[in-house]
């Protein structure tokens, strides 16, 4: 198995210890798998554009890039530094930074990780102990670096908890057969991955028997990105499926579990994820295949009672039509996400542990969050 730390880097972040200036480059995922190109992020607008255009994507990575982009903007961008030079009071400095945070939130509305990251950072700099502009900038740069490290360690914990849970039931000597959708690996995070991280941990233990990835139309994150990661990691018995093949595959080939990511998990367990996840969950239920969500603890949004309250981002028509061969002038509906009702979910894997439904089939996400906060 190839070491993912040496093969797949969704971003490159560095801080000069002498000057505290930060630099950031992100892997342009729209060019994969044909071309590997990193793009420099020098300000908040660059970070916003990279997120909005889906040059970077994946709920955990979106949050990380937003925070890192802000750190670079404040510490290294001469235009922003010049604007800060014109501000005298600490309250005005914090207000200036908060405006940039609020702008970053507008880049993509569905993933809660972005909002949580900005809110956490705002609480951090609002501390009365931070009294100067230099302390604000230094605190944000330090927080960005710690967030980057935390994302990788959290992802590895997600993989470990997920593998432990699955192997407690699936005892085939060659391991577990996994199906996944979209991309939830190193390219969707700061490293290792969430749902694909569970498969990676199974592989590390010699207990991944096979992995099937849905292509994930219309952006083909499964065929372009997940298949790329699977091949890089030399995962056993890989197979790529059209989205419409999922039912036939589960019926004729069989699988032990579907493991998917999440952009937001509501208080009742309803989960927003990449479009196509909902239908995969229905198929899995019909076929008696377990269906797990793997996501960071920060994806749990107890402020929303159910999936009916989630704002679903809709992408431009062209993103679908240009890759589908449709006739000119055809209209389409292009939601980026759908919501899987909690009743189709077998469990929610986080770095804190695995949340299972109660005897009546409902999830107590609020209780889980309260217990681990």
From Swiss-Prot:
GO molecular function, one term: S-methyl-5-thioribose-1-phosphate isomerase activity
Keyword Cytoplasm: yes
Enzyme Commission code(s) on record: 5.3.1.23
Keywords: Amino-acid biosynthesis, Cytoplasm, Isomerase, Methionine biosynthesis, Nucleus
InterPro entries: IF-2B-related (IPR000649), IF-M1Pi (IPR005251), IF_2B-like_C (IPR042529), Initiation_fac_2B_a/b/d (IPR011559), M1Pi_N (IPR027363), NagB/RpiA_transferase-like (IPR037171)
Site, Transition state stabilizer: residue positions: 182
Catalytic site: 263 (proton donor)
Gene3D superfamilies xref list: translation initiation factor eif-2b, domain 1, Translation initiation factor eif-2b, domain 2
Pfam families hit by this protein: IF-2B (PF01008)
Enzyme's top EC category: isomerase
Pathway: Amino-acid biosynthesis; L-methionine biosynthesis via salvage pathway; L-methionine from S-methyl-5-thio-alpha-D-ribose 1-phosphate: step 1/6
UniProt family annotation: Belongs to the eIF-2B alpha/beta/delta subunits family. MtnA subfamily.
HAMAP family: Salvage_MtnA
Protein name as annotated: Methylthioribose-1-phosphate isomerase
Organism annotation: Thalassiosira pseudonana (Marine diatom)
Organism phylogeny: Eukaryota, Sar, Stramenopiles, Ochrophyta, Bacillariophyta
């Amino acid at each position: 198995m190839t070491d993912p730390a040496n093969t797949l880097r969704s971003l490159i972040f560095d801080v000069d210890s002498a000057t505290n200036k930060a630099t950031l480059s992100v892997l342009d995922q729209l060019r994969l798998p044909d071309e590997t190109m990193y793009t420099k992020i020098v300000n908040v607008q660059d970070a916003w554009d990279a997120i909005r255009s889906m040059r970077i994507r994946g709920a955990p990575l979106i949050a990380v890039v937003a925070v890192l982009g802000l750190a670079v903007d404040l510490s290294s961008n001469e235009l922003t530094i010049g604007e800060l030079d014109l501000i005298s009071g600490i309250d005005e400095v914090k207000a200036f930074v908060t405006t940039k945070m609020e702008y970053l939130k507008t880049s993509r509305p569905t993933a809660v990780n972005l909002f949580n990251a900005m809110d956490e950072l705002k609480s951090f700099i609002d501390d009365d102990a931070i009294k100067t502009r230099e302390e604000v900038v230094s605190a944000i740069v330090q927080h960005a670096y710690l967030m980057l490290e935390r994302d990788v360690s959290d992802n590895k914990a997600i993989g470990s908890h997920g593998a432990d849970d699955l192997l407690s039931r699936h005892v085939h000597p060659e391991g577990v057969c996994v199906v996944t959708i979209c991309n939830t690996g190193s390219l969707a995070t700061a490293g290792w991955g969430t749902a694909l991280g569970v498969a990676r941990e199974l592989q590390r233990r010699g207990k991944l028997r096979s992995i099937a990835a849905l292509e994930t139309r219309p952006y083909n994150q499964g065929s372009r990105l997940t298949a790329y990661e699977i091949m890089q990691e030399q995962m056993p018995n890989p197979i790529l499926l059209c989205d419409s093949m999922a039912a036939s595959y589960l019926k004729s080939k069989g699988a032990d579990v579907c493991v998917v990511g999440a952009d937001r998990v509501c208080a009742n367990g309803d989960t927003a994820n990449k479009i196509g996840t909902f239908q995969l969950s229905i198929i899995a239920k019909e076929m008696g295949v377990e269906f797990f969500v793997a996501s960071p603890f920060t994806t749990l949004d107890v402020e929303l009672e159910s999936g009916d309250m989630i704002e679903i981002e809709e992408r431009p028509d062209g993103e679908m039509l240009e890759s589908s061969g449709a006739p000119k002038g055809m209209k389409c509906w292009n939601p980026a996400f759908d919501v899987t009702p909690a009743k189709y979910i077998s469990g929610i894997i986080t770095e804190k542990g695995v949340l299972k439904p109660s005897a009546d089939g409902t999830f107590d996400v609020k209780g889980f969050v309260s217990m681990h906060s």
